[in-house]
């Protein structure tokens, strides 16, 4: 079969194009014999898809919520400048329940039925002393993985050769989850003092929250007994949070020179968490109107978020995923005939090689013939050792509404913001862990994420990753800075009939989006993301609207700035003789290389609506010019069929819509 494959004219010509000779010429000239000859009996692995295996899920969900409250005035608190006091109190109870059942093939039963636990490969026999569950051995039926029914002609999905085999192998995976919450809250509000600029208003409140989660898997789910399916040990835990809060609004100045209005708002909250003790958050807001059309505003505040129940109590969920290992010799650095390592063809960054070596892997010996993506067991889980998230933020900006003409409306606004979050709770992905560990510029393998990678180092030529910990972890610091802009204009245009025209432009400039991790050796890993996927430096949206009588026509344009992947994660080029991620698509493409750049992106939509007293009818077109999303390398960007997903690009193309709305009881 291999000889016939190599003699196929197209295959032979392809090899000749790459290496100068056909397989037959390599053999006849005495260079190398690529023809294996008769191999005799060889072992094979059946690859089948079984009807109903892990793809049918039965789900039951129910939810109920009860709320009881009372509110009213407090007349006995009206004395002097203390007046207009009122109260509001409520208690709520919520219960959410879910039950799921999935059917599939038990891996332990399949192995037992195929003789994996027998020294003579006898089905349904265990003479090696393996510890097997009683429900795995009871009723065992030998299974024929080469039954014709598993390979139906013209179909992808087959079935086992007998009902007895199917009944023995199949089991159910059951999961019951219950989430319960009780909230009791009360607050009072009123005026406490009269100043020359107005009344000072005060609000006081208290809130108690109780949360409980009970997520119970059966043994099949908890132990991951389905073939090729993850385990999930569920979650058990509860938490109580008590809070008191206060807010005061103080009008400092009003109707004086350079201060038509000057207000200050102060608020604070004390939170007592069962697991994280007592914490405080504060907020200050200032609004100053030097002249009536102009408002200058600023805010400062802190925030606190304790880890939620899942982040605290998730008992552990395991599974398998494909992981690209940069410590293995890439295909482009291998001799295409002998498979030997060629150092001068190795284009990996020096810090990758250094970090691999620092973590116990020789990146010049680890060799899997260029196939460096492996299936790796991963585990997610919660932790009571997580720190709470804390943040500090401040903003400053202005809003201006013109008052020099009553013929048109014009408003301008701008806000600068800066948010600094410490101890952000994240659930790192395999790609994030690999990248942070092996692209660390220090090259010492000191990244905090290197400890989440477990390898089998018994064979230096094959130090495979066998386990990765994806459990929740605190990120030391996360910073976001930027500027938001908005412009609104409205005027009436007379073209025989009055047309109301408006334009609304909003835009955002991202100045910084960065993260920091402190490694065990004290060094700091800092990553910046502005201009990369998911964080374009500029975003904007323009809405043009024209209204006449009951008709409204709209044109909307959305803009996303160009983005690119982190340069540290992009290989400059790849071997044309090896497997390449892209050899087409990039503008002016001359190299086979990783490519994950998107140019400026504009998306246009339009609509026309008629609004009657009790009904509305309209139609429109989304993505008027049928703008396609960018094409990217799927190994660099989250994508499907080389199309980025989750980044704001339209995936549907030009679409038409028609809406009819009827309002019961009139307008």
Question: Model-found features: residue ranges?
Answer:
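Surface-exposed, low-complexity loop segments enriched in small/polar and acidic residues
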Residues: 1-241, 257, 305-388, 411-484, ...
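Residues that define the transmembrane beta-barrel architecture of outer-membrane proteins
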Residues: 60-66, 180-182, 198, 238-244, ...
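Short loop/turn motifs that connect adjacent beta-strands in outer-membrane beta-barrel proteins
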Residues: 73-86, 193-200, 253-262, 293, ...
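Transmembrane beta-strands of outer-membrane beta-barrel pores
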Residues: 74, 91-99, 192, 206-214, ...
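Transmembrane beta-strands of outer-membrane beta-barrel proteins
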Residues: 83-91, 200-206, 246, 260-266, ...
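Outer-membrane beta-barrel translocator domains and adjoining extracellular loop/strand segments
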Residues: 100-106, 215-221, 259, 276-282, ...
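Gram-negative outer-membrane beta-barrel transporters
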Residues: 409-569, 659-663
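C-terminal beta-signal and adjacent terminal beta-strands/loops
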Residues: 511-514, 557-576, 609-667
């Amino acid at each position: 079969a291999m000889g016939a494959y190599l003699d196929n004219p197209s295959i032979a010509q392809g090899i000749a194009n790459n290496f100068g000779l056909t397989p037959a010429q390599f053999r006849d000239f005495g260079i190398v014999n690529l023809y294996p000859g008769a191999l005799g009996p060889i072992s094979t692995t059946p690859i089948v898809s079984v009807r109903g295996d892990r793809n049918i899920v039965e789900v039951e969900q129910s939810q109920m919520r009860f709320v009881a409250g009372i509110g009213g005035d407090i007349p006995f608190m009206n004395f002097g400048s203390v007046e207009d006091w009122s109260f509001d109190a409520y208690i709520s109870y919520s219960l959410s329940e879910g039950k799921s059942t999935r059917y599939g093939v038990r891996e332990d039963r399949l192995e037992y039925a195929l003789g994996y636990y027998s020294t003579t490969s006898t089905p349904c026999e265990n003479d090696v002393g393996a510890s097997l569950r009683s429900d795995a051995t009871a009723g065992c039926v030998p299974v024929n993985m080469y039954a014709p029914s598993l390979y139906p002609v013209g179909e992808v999905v087959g079935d086992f050769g007998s009902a007895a085999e199917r009944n023995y192998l199949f089991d159910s995976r059951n999961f019951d989850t219950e989430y319960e919450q009780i909230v009791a809250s009360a607050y009072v509000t009123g005026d406490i003092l009269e100043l020359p600029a107005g009344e000072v208003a005060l609000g006081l409140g208290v809130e108690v929250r109780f949360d409980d989660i009970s997520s119970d898997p059966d043994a099949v789910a908890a132990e991951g007994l389905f073939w090729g399916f993850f385990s999930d040990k569920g979650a058990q835990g509860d938490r109580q949070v008590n809070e008191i809060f206060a807010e005061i609004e103080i009008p400092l100045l009003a109707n004086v020179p350079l201060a038509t209005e000057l207000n200050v708002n102060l608020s604070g909250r004390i939170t007592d968490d069962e697991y994280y003790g007592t914490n405080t958050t504060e907020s200050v807001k200032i609004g100053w109107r030097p002249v009536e059309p102009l408002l200058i505003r600023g805010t400062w505040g802190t925030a606190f978020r304790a880890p939620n129940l899942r982040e605290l109590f998730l008992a552990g969920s395991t599974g398998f995923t494909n992981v690209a290992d940069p410590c293995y010799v890439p295909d482009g650095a291998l001799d295409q005939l002998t498979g030997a390592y060629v150092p001068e063809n190795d284009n990996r960054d020096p810090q990758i090689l250094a970090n691999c070596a620092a973590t116990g892997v020789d990146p010049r010996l680890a060799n899997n013939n260029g196939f460096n993506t492996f299936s790796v067991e991963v585990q997610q889980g919660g932790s009571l050792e997580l720190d709470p998230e804390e943040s500090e933020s401040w903003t400053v900006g202005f809003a201006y509404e013109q008052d020099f003409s009553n013929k048109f409306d014009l408003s301008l606004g701008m806000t600068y913001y800066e948010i600094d979050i410490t101890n952000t709770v994240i659930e790192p992905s395999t790609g994030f862990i690999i990248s942070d560990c092996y692209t660390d510029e220090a090259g010492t393998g000191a990244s905090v994420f290197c400890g989440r990678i477990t390898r089998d180092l018994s064979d230096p030529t094959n130090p495979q990753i066998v386990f990765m910990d994806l459990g929740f972890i605190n990120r030391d610091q996360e910073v976001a800075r930027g500027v938001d802009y908005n412009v609104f204009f409205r005027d009436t245009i007379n073209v025989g009939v009055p047309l109301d025209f408006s334009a609304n432009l909003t835009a955002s400039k991202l100045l910084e989006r960065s993260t920091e991790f402190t490694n065990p050796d004290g060094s700091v890993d800092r990553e910046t993301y502005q201009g990369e996927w998911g964080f374009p430096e500029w975003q904007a949206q323009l809405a043009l609207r024209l209204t006449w009588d009951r008709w409204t026509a709209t044109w909307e344009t959305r803009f996303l700035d160009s983005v690119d992947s982190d340069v540290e994660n992009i290989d400059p080029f790849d071997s044309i003789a090896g497997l390449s991620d892209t050899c087409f698509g990039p503008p002016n493409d001359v190299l086979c290389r990783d490519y994950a750049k998107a140019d400026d992106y504009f998306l246009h939509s339009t609509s026309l609506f008629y609004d009657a007293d009790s009904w509305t009818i309209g139609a429109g077109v989304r993505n008027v010019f049928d703008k396609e999303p960018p094409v990217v390398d799927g190994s660099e960007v989250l994508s499907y069929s080389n199309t980025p997903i989750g980044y704001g690009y339209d995936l549907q193309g030009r679409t038409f819509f028609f809406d009819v709305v009827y309002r019961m009881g009139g307008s």
